Curated annotation (Swiss-Prot):
Primary subcellular site in the record, as a coarse category: cytoplasm
Protein name, entry field: Argininosuccinate synthase
Protein species of origin: Aquifex aeolicus (strain VF5)
Enzyme Commission no: 6.3.4.5
Phylogenetic classification of the source organism: Bacteria, Pseudomonadati, Aquificota, Aquificia, Aquificales
Sequence positions that bind ATP: A9, Y10, S11, G12, G13, L14, D15, T16, S17, A35, G116
């Protein structure tokens, strides 16, 4: 009898490592798929780890530039932060991975694709909605939703029993998801929202207390909304600029986020994120937009786009006309976003200290209070009178006049 074939989204972490063995014991033929979206050095161990766990084949694909160009950049252009804080580090990679799972399922005639998401997490929605949008006939398996393990400690014991190497231990039971855009960390002592995160939970950022005592200045250059220069050096590959900025900002403790967020399934979850490069780029791009956009467009953009874009990414709606429409809007805005932004990094903080653009709408002669002032202040008097007319009428009515 022919075995059922499944393409598994494989990170090499605790959950997906034991999923390989678990599916194999259930009679599945497992092919693992790993997208290199900037996980770092750990990726070199992935194929051997997958085969040791029972996979018949392990696919690793370099998608760093695809991830940077087609996922990180559009999200940056939207200034998307879920609930005003989370830069969507893990969430952004899910539709890309799902797209490749579908590709390889079709290529290898697999009956199923599988992921390692839990029944109370967000990723189950992101993976499955993306797969269905691309190929509604493919069935999705989620072993974590139905297997027998009740705790992370039991999973660690299972992995140790089958000699499956994983980083998680009973002493350090973190679940870590890392890519080019940042790191997501949860579980273990982090589940108590009152307790400060242990320093060993952080992966790519220095503790602000131990960061350099001198600030470091960086300059990010944009061309039509795309960061292409870092400190005067041009980057033809977007992922390399982000990676270098991660290293620079990370050593200054920039980009640490500790938040309680609202998951899709209705629960609140304490999450730790590290996104040094992303947070520097967000700060820089927002400031550049404030320089080059008129007030009406800038205010509309800030009021609507960041929230709506973050929401659709978080909720697994990447492959929708809504996302395409919002991309069209942000791409139009980006046509004006050429210029440089200078930022100061110091002990966990990032602040803009300078900006310039050939499309700048800042006119010094209108803004200055010096003798160069060209603003017609008499016009200001009449403007104020017209602008305040509704309140003047309101005041008269309330006073009965």
């Amino acid at each position: 009898m022919k075995k059922k074939r499944v393409i598994l989204a494989y990170s090499g972490g605790l959950d997906t490592s034991i999923i390989v063995r678990w599916l194999t014991e259930k009679g599945y033929e497992v092919i693992t798929y790993t997208a290199d979206v900037g996980q770092g050095e750990e990726l070199s161990e992935i194929p051997e780890k997958a085969r040791r766990a029972g996979a018949i084949e392990a696919i690793v694909e370099d998608l760093k530039e695809t991830f940077a160009e087609n996922y990180c950049l559009p999200t940056l252009r939207a200034l998307a932060l879920y609930e005003g804080k989370y830069p969507l580090t893990a969430a952004l990679s899910r539709p890309l991975i799902a797209e490749r799972l579908v590709y390889y399922a079709e290529k290898f005639n697999a009956d199923y694709v599988a992921h390692g998401s839990t029944g109370k997490g967000n990723d189950q929605v992101r993976f499955e909605l993306s797969v269905w949008a691309l190929n509604p006939d493919i069935e999705v398996l989620a072993p974590v939703r139905e297997w027998e393990f009740k705790s992370r400690e039991e999973q660690v014991e299972y992995a140790q029993r089958f000699n499956i190497p994983v980083k998680a231990t009973k002493e350090k039971p973190y679940s870590i998801d890392r890519n080019l855009w940042g790191v997501s960390i949860e579980c273990g002592p982090l589940e108590d929202p009152w307790q400060e995160p242990p320093q060993d939970a952080y992966q790519i950022t220095q503790s602000p207390e131990e960061a350099p005592d001198e600030p470091e200045y960086v300059t990010v250059g944009f061309e039509k909304g795309k960061p292409v220069y870092l400190n005067g050096e041009r980057y033809e590959e977007q992922w390399k600029l982000i990676a270098n900025l991660n290293e620079i900002a990370g050593r200054h403790g920039v980009g640490r986020i500790d938040m309680v967020e609202n998951r899709l399934v209705g629960i609140k979850s304490r999450e730790i994120y590290e996104a040094p490069g992303a947070m520097v780029l967000y700060e820089a791009y927002r400031d550049l937009l404030s320089l080059v956009l008129d007030r009406f467009t800038f205010h509309y953009f800030l009021t609507h786009i960041p929230h709506e874009y973050a929401k659709l990414v978080y909720e697994g709606l990447w492959f929708t006309p809504l996302r395409e429409a919002l991309d069209a809007f942000t791409n139009k805005i980006a046509e004006f976003a050429t210029g440089e932004v200078r930022l100061k990094l110091y002990k966990g903080s990032v602040s803009v200290v300078g900006r310039r653009s050939p499309n700048s709408l800042y006119v010094e002669e209108l803004a200055t209070y010096s003798e160069k002032d060209q603003f017609d202040q008499i016009a200001g008097k009449h403007f104020t009178k017209v602008w305040g007319l509704p309140l003047k009428v309101l005041g008269r009515v309330r006073k009965g006049k």
